[in-house]
Swiss-Prot record:
CDD domains: DNase1. Keywords: Actin-binding, Apoptosis, Calcium, Cytoplasmic vesicle, Disulfide bond, Endonuclease, Glycoprotein, Hydrolase, Nuclease, Nucleus, Secreted, Signal. One of its GO terms (cellular component) is nuclear envelope. Serum endocuclease secreted into body fluids by a wide variety of exocrine and endocrine organs. Expressed by non-hematopoietic tissues and preferentially cleaves protein-free DNA. Among other functions, seems to be involved in cell death by apoptosis. Binds specifically to G-actin and blocks actin polymerization. It comes from the Eukaryota. It catalyses: Endonucleolytic cleavage to 5'-phosphodinucleotide and 5'-phosphooligonucleotide end-products. Glycans are attached at residue 38. Disulfide bonds join 121-124, 193-229. This is Deoxyribonuclease-1. The gene is DNASE1. It comes from Gallus gallus (Chicken).
Length: 282
């Protein structure tokens, strides 16, 4: 009888762990065919992404999605769970373009809706974002909050304060469009060091929005290089979403330490570490 109770407790614990949702944002520097053709680097990327249920991948340079498809195929081979992806179109003001790609476990989450934030006339030079957010609403039946929105941003370093500030307008736009403020803002905001200084933070509206909480602090280091900068951030908005976040789960994944690799090998993967957060099980 005691053994049965222990087995049931173990099964319940496994179910609870499986029902939480681990989400990350990862700028994989210049992700494309060249990176995926390196078997060692590709293997490391798979070993990082397989830890997550949703990953926002940034700096994807893969217009035909061949490297993304290869990555997801390798993820599906490495995991006992199925992964799918949703990609934006290539975004950028000139010939240099990047994609936002969401890679997610399709057995526990699904995409409900998506749209591109309209930030003004690109050809006129009056748009705000270098890479406008590709906004996605997810369904997550296993977590306390069963629907939430992710707004991605890879900010242009030279205009990072203005782009982060404009996320408040995106916040309002999502509320008007989908009638929810349960929103994650995440990505490489370039939100520290010389790109966003201490003097600039007071004028950034998202920083002081009472409904939002900055989960990755200014003291964090999200860089693989010798710099110490909190470029990559996760911001949780909406009371239901903030309450659904597992306490203490927001962190930086230092894969150089967890994979026990040298700095040069870590830099072959990216110059950024992923940032992550976990949603509580239902």
């Amino acid at each position: 009888m005691a053994r049965l109770v222990l087995e049931l407790l173990a099964a319940a614990l496994l179910l609870r762990v499986a029902a939480t949702l681990r989400i990350s944002a990862f700028n994989i520097r210049t992700f494309g065919d060249s990176k995926m053709s390196n078997q060692t680097v590709a293997g490391f990327i798979v070993s990082i992404l397989v830890q997550y249920d949703i990953t926002l991948v940034q700096e994807v340079r893969d217009a035909d999605l061949s490297s993304v498809k290869k990555l997801v195929s390798q993820l599906n081979s490495a995991s006992s769970y199925p992964y799918s992806f949703l990609s934006s179109i290539p975004l950028g003001r000139n010939s240099y373009k990047e994609q936002y790609v969401f890679i997610y476990r399709s057995d526990i989450v699904s995409v409900l809706e998506s749209y591109y934030y309209d930030d003004g006339c690109e050809s006129c030079g009056t748009d705000i974002f270098s890479r406008e957010p590709f906004i996605v609403k997810f369904s997550s039946p296993t977590t306390q909050l069963d629907e939430f929105v992710i707004v991605p941003l890879h900010a242009e370093p030279s205009s990072a304060p203005a782009e982060i500030n404009a996320l408040t307008d995106v916040y309002t736009d999502v509320i008007n469009k989908w009638e929810t403020n349960n929103i994650f803002f995440m990505g490489d905001f370039n939100a520290d060091c010389s790109y966003v200084t201490a003097e600039q933070w007071p004028s950034i509206r998202l920083r002081s929005l009472s409904s939002c909480e900055w989960l990755i602090p200014d003291s964090a280091d999200t860089t693989v290089t010798s710099t110490d900068c909190a470029y990559d951030r996760i911001v949780a908005c909406g009371s239901a979403l903030r309450q659904a976040v597992e306490y203490g789960s927001a962190t930086v994944n230092n894969f150089q330490e967890t994979l026990r690799i040298q700095n040069k090998d870590a830099l072959a993967i990216s110059d950024h570490f992923p940032v992550e957060v976990t949603l509580k099980a239902r």
